[in-house]
């Protein structure tokens, strides 16, 4: 990195010393976090690099000795773990029964093993991938949902990472200068299997495993996956621009920007890109970068000028990665984004989409890899690439800001980037462990399940294009194509394991869990209120005994735990939990004449370990077709004319927040195994055993006993 690229962050520490805004209502780490670690990250990395350089000979010798001791017991030269997020065992077999071909999956199955893979309870990505990573049940790794609850505010917060603002600040007029640095903490507990492997001196690379942000420090290479924020500090906020007013469009998410005509021009417009919050100014004021857009309706294209650079946009096509820079004084923060000119037709409003602004991997302002230089190295190898955890913009598709075709293009663009990164790392791994998760299958199933025959989805299915209608099958086939390239390189003394964290099924009806808790008297509203706004805006906590949080959880309002808790531990709490369990188990969707809920668990019935106390008090397991409603997921207590269920008409029509036996994942291995009922928990001890390492005592999973 050139010295001039370091000067601005180095100057920044003199006045900013790291800044973060507490978790905001959209449940991101907090807008403004792009500045949170920008200098401290580089400053500390600089001195760590010097220390590492000076101590390298000693560390290399120790690592070599450990490696020699371990490898003499290893059964395989390389262990390769591939994750296909959300690939469903039943759907895979259904495709095969329809005559669809997966020759490379078949090759692995015929040579070794193909089984369903039991997920976690609930079978959702943060819980499942954390169990995969550690081999431990959630009571030992501390991840129970996408969200957990802030006991002081009852607001949701991300379960996987904790962003804490500086403890000390100094205010001078309208400016604020932090005097201490922010803290970024990975909330997952227990050791990952790759950390154990790397500690034995074995070369280890981990790419985009979900819930690895911030990347843990270990003697290997890591690029963080799901959970990594965008430059605004959110989990992915797109922008939408038009020459019409925002109220002309039905958009509830994202950032709307008005395109204003410039003087003396009929086809030139100006707009502003909203960046991270300015850390020096009160009021959460975002930094901005201006752009001009010159449209050609006849050619269905436009020229967009950002800074000194001009780029051509063609209607319906995704742009290249375009660099963006936001300045706060002398500090410049780098991001990258993609544009899609969705519509510039004659007589129609201009529709311009801007992706979430990704952290620029060439100049990362917060830790997205370990070591930091690894993300930079990949950018030199690949060019700009997606760094946001949930890079595929499902919200923009749901809001109809992004077309189905453009979304599919986006998914495969990111998939190709990840393939390139994987094969580069694979080529360098002559002996050791490499782990990679691909996410195209998950994203396609979430958004296109409605197109499957017999899905029963009430959601809109506007397309007749085979690329859209068959998007899920095509994503499975794309994974088979990837496997073809990999199998050409896999040797006899390599162990290949392919897994998914869960399967999939239809999400057709939403259950208003918080409305049910209100109706049953557990969640009480302020006097005169029959419904509550977002984030429990109108709840009377002094009278409430229970509330929903996340996709599957219910928390009691406990004395001494929640700020306004009223439920006493012991008999009272157990009585309430027993009541809720019994009543929920009897809930029926009267309109559809179906049971909505398959099982209800107390947390102690599912989890064991020191972090069980952080789990929801009750975990709800939904029947296929049902899930917590979109309203309850963001803490509305909705009236809905008394209805407890509503159709899910969003494009997000597939899901997996059911019970784990309803959505098994897939397990492939190029060797036979002795166990015929593998679980996600078993992957960690199996990998350790294959590399000659005894699994540690905290691990709950079994060694699958791979046959040599």
Language-model features: locations:
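Active-site-proximal N-terminal segment of extracellular/periplasmic enzymes that hydrolyze or transfer
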Residues: 64-113, 699
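N-terminal secretory/membrane targeting signals
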Residues: 1-25
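Polar, surface-exposed loop/tail segments
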Residues: 215-218, 506, 577-579, 586-615, ...
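A short beta-strand-to-alpha-helix junction
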Residues: 185-188, 477, 525-550, 566-578, ...
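Histidine-centered active-site microenvironments of extracellular/periplasmic hydrolases
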Residues: 500-551, 607-665
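Short, structured active-site-proximal loop/turn typified by the sulfatase FGly-forming signature C/S-X-P-X-R
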Residues: 92-143, 147, 205, 524-525
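His/Asp/Glu-rich, glycine-adjacent segments
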Residues: 136-463, 545-595, 629
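Metal-dependent active-site segment of extracytoplasmic phospho-/sulfohydrolases and closely related
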Residues: 104, 476-517, 595-603, 611, ...
């Amino acid at each position: 990195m050139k010295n001039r690229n370091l000067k601005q962050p180095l100057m920044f520490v003199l006045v900013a010393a790291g800044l973060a805004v507490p978790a905001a209502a959209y449940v991101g780490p907090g807008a403004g976090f792009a500045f949170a670690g920008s200098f401290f990250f580089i400053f500390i990395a600089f001195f760590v690099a010097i220390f590492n350089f000076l101590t390298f000979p000693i560390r290399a010798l120790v690592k070599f000795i450990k490696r020699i001791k371990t490898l003499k017991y290893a059964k395989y030269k390389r262990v390769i773990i591939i994750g296909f997020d959300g690939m469903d065992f039943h759907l895979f077999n259904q495709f095969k029964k329809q005559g669809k071909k997966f020759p490379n999956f078949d090759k692995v199955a015929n040579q070794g093993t193909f089984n369903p893979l039991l997920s976690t309870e609930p079978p959702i990505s943060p819980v499942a991938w954390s169990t995969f990573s550690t081999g431990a049940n959630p009571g030992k790794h501390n991840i129970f949902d996408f969200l957990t609850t802030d006991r002081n505010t009852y607001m949701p917060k991300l379960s996987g990472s904790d962003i804490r603002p500086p403890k000390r600040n100094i205010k001078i007029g309208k400016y604020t200068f932090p005097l201490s640095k922010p803290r970024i903490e990975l909330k997952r507990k227990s050791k990952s299997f790759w950390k154990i492997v790397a500690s034995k001196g074995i070369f280890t690379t981990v790419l985009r495993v979900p819930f690895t942000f911030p990347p843990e420090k270990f003697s290997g290479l890591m690029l963080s996956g799901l959970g990594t924020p965008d430059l605004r500090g959110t989990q992915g906020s797109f922008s939408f621009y038009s020459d019409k007013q925002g109220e002309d469009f039905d958009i509830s998410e994202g950032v709307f920007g008005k395109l204003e005509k410039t003087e003396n021009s009929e086809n030139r417009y100006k707009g502003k890109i909203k960046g991270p919050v300015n850390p020096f100014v009160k009021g959460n004021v975002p930094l901005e970068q201006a752009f001009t857009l010159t449209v050609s309706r006849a050619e269905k294209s436009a020229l967009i000028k950002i800074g000194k650079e001009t780029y051509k946009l063609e209607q319906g096509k995704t742009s290249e990665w375009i660099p963006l820079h936001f300045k706060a004084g002398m500090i410049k923060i780098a991001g990258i984004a993609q544009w899609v000119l969705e519509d510039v037709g004659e007589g129609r409003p201009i529709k311009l989409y801007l992706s979430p602004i990704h952290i620029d991997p060439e100049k990362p302002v917060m830790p997205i890899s370990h070591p930091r230089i690894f993300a930079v190295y990949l950018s030199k190898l690949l060019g700009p690439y997606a760094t946001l955890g949930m890079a595929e913009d499902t919200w923009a598709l749901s809001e109809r800001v992004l077309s189905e075709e453009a979304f599919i293009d986006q998914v495969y663009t990111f998939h190709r980037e990840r393939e390139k990164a994987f094969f580069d790392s694979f080529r360098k791994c002559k002996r050791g462990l490499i782990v990679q998760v691909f996410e195209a299958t998950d994203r396609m199933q979430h958004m296109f399940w409605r197109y499957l025959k017999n899905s029963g989805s009430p959601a809109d299915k506007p397309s007749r294009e085979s690329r859209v209608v068959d998007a899920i099958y095509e994503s499975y086939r794309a994974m088979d194509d990837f496997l073809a390239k990999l199998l050409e390189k896999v040797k006899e003394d390599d162990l290949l394991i392919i897994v998914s964290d869960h399967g999939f099924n239809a999400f057709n009806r939403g259950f208003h869990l918080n409305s049910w808790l209100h109706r049953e008297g557990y969640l009480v509203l302020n006097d005169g209120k029959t419904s509550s706004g977002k984030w429990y805006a109108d709840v009377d906590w002094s009278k409430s005994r229970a509330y929903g949080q996340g996709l599957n959880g219910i928390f009691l309002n406990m004395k001494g735990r929640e700020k306004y808790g009223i439920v006493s531990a012991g008999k009272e709490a157990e009585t309430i939990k027993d009541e809720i369990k019994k009543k929920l188990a009897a809930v029926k969707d009267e309109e559809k004449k179906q049971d909505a809920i398959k099982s209800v668990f107390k947390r102690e019935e599912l989890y064991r370990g020191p972090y069980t106390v952080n789990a929801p008090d009750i975990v709800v397991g939904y029947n296929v077709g049902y899930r917590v409603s979109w309203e309850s997921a963001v803490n509305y207590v909705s009236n809905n004319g008394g209805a407890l269920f509503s159709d899910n008409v969003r494009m997000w029509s597939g899901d997996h927040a059911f019970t784990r036996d309803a959505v098994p994942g897939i397990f492939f291995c190029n060797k036979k195994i002795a166990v015929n009922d593998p679980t996600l928990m078993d992957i960690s001890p199996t990998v350790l055993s294959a590399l000659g390492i005894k699994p540690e005592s905290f691990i709950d999973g079994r060694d699958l006993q791979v046959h040599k």
